């Protein structure tokens, strides 16, 4: 199910569409370094492509089960897992507000956590290697 991210079918004439959005080089020549880019199209791919959406749901599901009583602990776990640092209190409160809003919209608990995980995975800090 999650192998799509590992095993992507490449053609020399037309690369995978998601790879084009992330500025993957053509396979016609070897490139030592990739360019660092961050475009709105990349965010659109990360929000809508099943290749990114399904892992976000799985991450949200794990974070939800970290501590069912205190969602802030689940958010902190997810933050450490994705960004390798502790979240600030402002970051935790924003994600708690997002969880509350998503629950009020009528989404289930699992879907609300999936949206929160998607937000973390779409952060520039997660996408861009520095």
Predicted region positions:
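An acidic, gly/pro-interrupted, aromatic-rich
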Residues: 1-74, 109-130
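C-terminal structured "cap/appendage" subdomains that terminate the fold
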Residues: 63-117
């Amino acid at each position: 199910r999650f192998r799509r991210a590992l095993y992507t079918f490449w053609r020399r004439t037309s690369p995978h569409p998601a790879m084009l959005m992330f500025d993957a080089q053509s396979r016609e020549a070897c490139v030592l370094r990739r360019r660092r880019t961050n475009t709105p199209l990349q965010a659109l791919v990360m929000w809508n492509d099943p290749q990114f959406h399904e892992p976000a749901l799985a991450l949200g599901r794990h974070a939800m089960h970290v501590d069912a009583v205190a969602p802030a602990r689940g958010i902190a776990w997810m933050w450490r897992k994705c960004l390798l640092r502790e979240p600030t209190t402002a970051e935790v409160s924003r994600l708690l507000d997002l969880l509350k809003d998503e629950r009020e919209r009528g989404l289930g608990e699992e879907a609300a956590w999936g949206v929160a995980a998607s937000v973390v995975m779409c952060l520039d800090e997660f996408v861009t290697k520095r």
